[in-house]
């Protein structure tokens, strides 16, 4: 069995890379979870139960991180010594800042006009942009361009927030 301090990738015996076989991750998760699930240790002593709980928690956290592409990229950069620092590093390229303002303006206009179709179209545009940027992020990570990958992660985090705002506006207008 791996150590509690091993990387998420090592825990599931997967290569530490952005591209991930989702079915291999799912299979590895079920395998590890079957070994460490606290129910297997119901008759064990308190110390063994605590360790089993730590392993189960660690396994769940690792799985949740690796199955989400944005969390996986952030974690991979962390392993490479890069702190994405989205909270305190908001510097972004000017073209992306302009795009942000356009998206925000479109959201405000569509919400004010109670135009759900416009919000749906904007959400589709955002999801397309997100897919394209995830492809770019994968290439950056594969090539070792970690600083550029960090900026790409911050941009994707922003896109995710904007998409969530659109979803909230759509829900508000539909209710």
UniProtKB/Swiss-Prot annotation:
The keyword Chaperone applies. PROSITE patterns: DNAJ_2. Residues 7-79 form the J domain. GO terms for cellular component: iron-sulfur cluster transfer complex. GO terms for molecular function: ATPase activator activity; protein-folding chaperone binding. The keyword Chaperone applies. GO terms for biological process: [2Fe-2S] cluster assembly; protein complex oligomerization; protein folding. Keywords: Chaperone. Pfam families: HSCB_C. It comes from the Bacteria. InterPro entries: DnaJ_domain (IPR001623), HscB (IPR004640), HscB_C_sf (IPR036386), HscB_oligo_C (IPR009073), J_dom_sf (IPR036869). Gene3D superfamilies: DnaJ domain, HscB, C-terminal domain. Disulfide bonds: none annotated. SUPFAM superfamilies: Chaperone J-domain, HSC20 (HSCB), C-terminal oligomerisation domain. Co-chaperone involved in the maturation of iron-sulfur cluster-containing proteins. Seems to help targeting proteins to be folded toward HscA. NCBIfam families: hscB, PRK03578.1. Interacts with HscA and stimulates its ATPase activity. Belongs to the HscB family. This is Co-chaperone protein HscB homolog. It comes from Paraburkholderia xenovorans (strain LB400). The gene is hscB.
């Amino acid at each position: 069995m791996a150590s509690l301090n091993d990387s998420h990738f090592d825990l599931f015996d997967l290569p530490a890379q952005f591209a991930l076989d989702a079915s291999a991750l799912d299979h590895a998760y079920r395998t590890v979870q079957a070994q460490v699930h606290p129910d297997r240790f119901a008759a064990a002593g308190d110390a063994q139960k605590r360790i089993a709980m730590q392993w189960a928690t660690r396994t769940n956290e690792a799985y949740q991180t690796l199955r989400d592409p944005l969390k996986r990229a952030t974690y991979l950069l962390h392993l490479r010594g890069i702190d994405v620092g989205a909270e305190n590093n908001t510097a972004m390229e000017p073209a992306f800042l302009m795009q942000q303002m356009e998206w925000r303006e479109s959201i405000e206009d569509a919400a004010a006009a109670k135009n759900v179709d416009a919000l749906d179209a904007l959400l589709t545009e955002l999801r397309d942009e997100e897919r394209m940027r995830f492809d770019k992020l994968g290439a950056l990570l594969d090539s070792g361009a970690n600083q550029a990958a960090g900026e790409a992660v911050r941009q994707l985090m922003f896109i995710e927030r904007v998409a969530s705002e659109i979803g909230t506006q759509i829900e508000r207008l539909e209710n």
